[in-house]
């Protein structure tokens, strides 16, 4: 359901985007031109609807009901974030030209994209950043603008029907010509521009990430009356438009930084053809050291005759030429979303559409002239398919190291100088351990951590804080002084585990276990002939990895280390999107496998894991079958007195009854890394107790005596009660002894109030 819903969202690139382009910015800039409406607005009241699909609810979808046009419509939408951090880095200059960096808090979870249930061509683009819903709906080829009604105490909104015939766009064209493209090619060749190569192959429909750096010129800063907050607000509205325009190819544009020329333009901006190389040079000197990015664009409040922008073609991962210019002047404010999406298309390698290019409308996104259509043509798709495999930067999500986190009390992250951080004021009111000042409450010893209990106290030493997950994992216990559980440790790589497997990185890996994880408990490793037949092909169903964007055929000695091949598959599993199950039958042998192609953002279920047994004293490492003795470890079972196992730090984890560090003396078990359990023996302990020294247990001897005493006491009490009952019965008249219990009396009934939620089914 989620996949279907998201696919529908990605497919709905229709005329709504033109209206969104017009109306997104009319709320943040004083419009010199606006959409025309058909008649007066309707008053609507959005009502929250409980999502019936559990998958959609978990995926972050929410639904609202709106009644207009004589019928009820259900709007399903999902938040679209285009900032990697709420603390967006913003660079400005003072009067002396000194660069300053600020990290203002930016609300980024109030922009939504979605659709209207029951209409495959519908689309919704809404924001709640400014109170209520504001944005565009398209239903049955009709566009509507929605905005909060003011004043209103009942969440009322006004819904306007847009008159598409009266709403027109000003004719403009892109500054990129055939001659300009030829000059760009010569410039890049002369400059020996480095094109980052990628190992990503079939990226299609698995998402691209463009990390964008934006620069705002001085005229736009003055136009916003030197108010950086308004400039940031403008940029966020533009970002929503850009992402909507590029949804059809699953391109995510992420803003990593913003620079505002607050002290004048450092380069002339009047000539668009001179400005493009000048800006690229400026950014190389001034921007590269500030933030990481894939492309940088300059927003200029200047009219370049009839040109709306220009960019270098195919330079999205090129640090020298990865840039573009976008005009945001005068009545072109309402077209900025289209402009930036168009110029980013050039950065991605798309040229202007020719006469053979089509998208089902009169013109497409990459038309040389400005138009209302935002669909990509067949020519643009061909460019993406052919050239994006060589752009490694856009296949990677932004790294955590690229994201700055402002150290401040109240962000929910415990940082230097803080005892705790309960986050928002609402969370702090519910928190019994931490105060809004990021200090612990009176008598509280801790706030978070697996060794901090509900009373804000540190758990006693020996309290189990992390149970083992499997036979290759180890448990950890609190040490009594820290609120944190010790580091998550596991059994040393190379240790034998069930199924003729070996522990490796906390997993017991074997072909049978692997098949069961993918195809169910009845599945098992297929015949070696399957591995030989398929893994030597070198395709997405059988290979030994990738080199230079090509599948690698397995050598005969490595066939058991390529892709998993299974047999005895009773039922087909329900797998994530983009997986394909492959079945081959030859020479009375069945082989089941899954595919994986480069660019998929989900884990590969079918690659054989390191540590899997591939022969006597051989294991798979990096798709090669190597000798097991390649694991050289200082810790062995003999090191642990044969009373424990070695952990991944090559220290002994002792059995219950023996004490670390070497399991030579009696104790409670554990290790110097994981801690030790208390006197109580935990069922989650990983090792066997059979070798623990025997100790006399007094309780075992006392249990029979206690049981006999309890039984005798119960029998004595029962005999006394029976005797008294007989004496009382003998003293009653005969007629009373035979009277039915409810004779002459009305039975009583208890009235039970149903739960509140039953009142309104």
UniProtKB/Swiss-Prot annotation:
Residues 208-400 form the Peptidase M12B domain. Residues 719-761 are cytoplasmic. GO terms for molecular function: integrin binding; metal ion binding; metalloendopeptidase activity; metallopeptidase activity. Keywords: Developmental protein, Differentiation, Disulfide bond, EGF-like domain, Glycoprotein, Hydrolase, Membrane, Metal-binding, Metalloprotease, Protease, Signal, Spermatogenesis, Transmembrane, Transmembrane helix, Zinc, Zymogen. Residues 406-493 form the Disintegrin domain. GO terms for cellular component: external side of plasma membrane; sperm head plasma membrane. Pfam families: ADAM_CR (PF08516), Disintegrin (PF00200), Reprolysin (PF01421). Expressed exclusively in testis and more specifically on the surface of mature sperm (at protein level). Its cofactor is Zn(2+). Disulfide bonds join 323-393, 357-379, 359-364, 465-485, 635-646, 640-652, 654-663. Residues 35-697 are extracellular. Glycans are attached at residues 140, 227, 301, 378, 390, 479. Residues 1-34 form the signal peptide. The active site is at 343. It is found in: Membrane. Binds 1 zinc ion per subunit. Its main location: membrane. SMART domains: ACR, DISIN. A motif (Cysteine switch) lies at residues 172-179. Its EC number is 3.4.24.-. GO terms for biological process: cell differentiation; prevention of polyspermy; proteolysis; spermatogenesis. Plasma membrane protease present on mature sperm that may be involved in sperm function during epididymal maturation and/or fertilization. This is Disintegrin and metalloproteinase domain-containing protein 24. The gene is Adam24.
